[in-house]
Swiss-Prot record:
GO terms for molecular function: ATP binding; phosphorelay response regulator activity; phosphorelay sensor kinase activity; protein kinase activator activity. Oligomerizes, probably forms homodimers. Interacts in vivo with FloT, colocalizes with FloT-only membrane rafts. Oligomerization is assisted by FloT. Another study shows only minor colocalization with FloT membrane assemblies. The gene is resE. Member of the two-component regulatory system ResD/ResE involved in the global regulation of aerobic and anaerobic respiration. Probably phosphorylates ResD. It comes from the Bacteria. GO terms for cellular component: membrane raft; plasma membrane. Residues 194-246 form the HAMP domain. Gene3D superfamilies: 1.10.287.130, 6.10.340.10, Histidine kinase-like ATPase, C-terminal domain, PAS domain. The modification Phosphohistidine is found at residue 374. Its EC number is 2.7.13.3. It comes from Bacillus subtilis (strain 168). Residues 32-172 are extracellular. This is Sensor histidine kinase ResE. Keywords: ATP-binding, Cell membrane, Kinase, Membrane, Nucleotide-binding, Phosphoprotein, Transferase, Transmembrane, Transmembrane helix, Two-component regulatory system.
Amino acid sequence: MKFWKSVVGKLWFTILSLVLIVLFILTVLLLEFIENYHVEEAENDLTQLANKVAVILENHEDQALARSITWELADNLTSIAIIQDEKNHWYSPNDKNRLSSITVEQIQHDKDLNKALKDHKKVSKRTGLSDTDTDNERLIVGVPYEKDGKKGMVFLSQSLLAVKDTTKHTTRYIFLAAGIAIVLTTFFAFFLSSRVTYPLRKMREGAQDLAKGKFDTKIPILTQDEIGELATAFNQMGRQLNFHINALNQEKEQLSNILSSMADGVITINIDGTILVTNPPAERFLQAWYYEQNMNIKEGDNLPPEAKELFQNAVSTEKEQMIEMTLQGRSWVLLMSPLYAESHVRGAVAVLRDMTEERRLDKLREDFIANVSHELRTPISMLQGYSEAIVDDIASSEEDRKEIAQIIYDESLRMGRLVNDLLDLARMESGHTGLHYEKINVNEFLEKIIRKFSGVAKEKNIALDHDISLTEEEFMFDEDKMEQVFTNLIDNALRHTSAGGSVSISVHSVKDGLKIDIKDSGSGIPEEDLPFIFERFYKADKARTRGRAGTGLGLAIVKNIVEAHNGSITVHSRIDKGTTFSFYIPTKR
């Protein structure tokens, strides 16, 4: 900052200017006063001397003696002229060599002096009268006198050189004093302005530090005046700012943590439609839309058209708006609420909820109800129909009655299995699966499973193979539950494998457990159905017959049993290539 633009420069210049103006006025007035004072003193002295001369001339009979006495009264700077008329006038000796000499001609040439001479009146005048030698400003005093009836005038002339010399010396001292005063004022003004502005500079530096976020900045308190109070208030302001900024940061961090931990997406939108704040779920939503629109994620700050229209409606109506939209195969519910700044809308906040799982569960629930209704209605209808046939004696022969009774028996068993499966699944999903761990010989266990299905495989012309590679023959698991797992998976593999196909069972020891693979060369499972294959009543083959369908609960039960053993199960499949179910059972510690 330039010196003249600084507070120091302005204060220094202001104080110095005021002092200079005051000194100038005082100097002018003082010089005028001193000069006038000296002139007035000289005039008074000269008037007294003129009166004394007039008295001497009036009181002495011997005028020549009186004049001699008068000449003695005059000093080197004073000249005396005694004039009775144009012919009778006398001058003090050596007047021609004096700067103050005066003649009748000079008096007659001056209007005021000539008038006083004619009227015999007192006169006092400051004037410059030219003679042959010099041009000098003088003080002339005229006093009338009268002797023996003869009137005359006594004129005293005195040069003002002495007065001017005195005034010059006085002026030098005054200017010297003024110069000293100016120098002292300069130093004093600079010192005062620097002392005043030092705390201000510190406050400026402190304000700059505050602007940079250094809220612990303190200003030194050097005085107890208004500037000291200002420094105290500044320090208090810094502490308050530090406190409030910390509180805001804590609230911001808390709000950020809340937003980040929310399962729902949150988007804060400015009044012009630009996005201000988002949380991770909302960012995933926007990224999915940017990807769908082939937009650069870094450059994208727009909303989907549906969300933008909802935002405009919320701002215009000042009411909450809600829509459901599908993006990248996922269902989203979008709730838009206006944000207010005092009395006007300043933007809106959008809450996004991923409803894909809910919609899937709704679909599964509907399918579950439909499947349960279907699975129960079919055997009940058959039981009712064949029972009516027996009651109405429609079966005429014993063979027909046995056939009807067998059908009723089979359907009742089927309905019982469905109910038992539902009860088992409900117990497993509620965490009440009771496992009875015991050491089982894996080879013997697997041989029993193979024998159980070998007849069915042979009947369907399907090759049933197995491969066992174990480090230990015995393993801890629930034999009944694990047999249920193998039964469900092998039964599914055989039912969905055509004649001439194959089903292989592989059991291998892995680190801390067993790895089992059940692979078939059947029809396979569509890729879009793989994520839901372990849901209750989910059927990948929607067109398969009841004979192949089973209850639709087998794989759900399998998954729950495996997970009850702290294991995991996966499935890999390709259409017309076959399916492989792989599950892992950890060693029981």
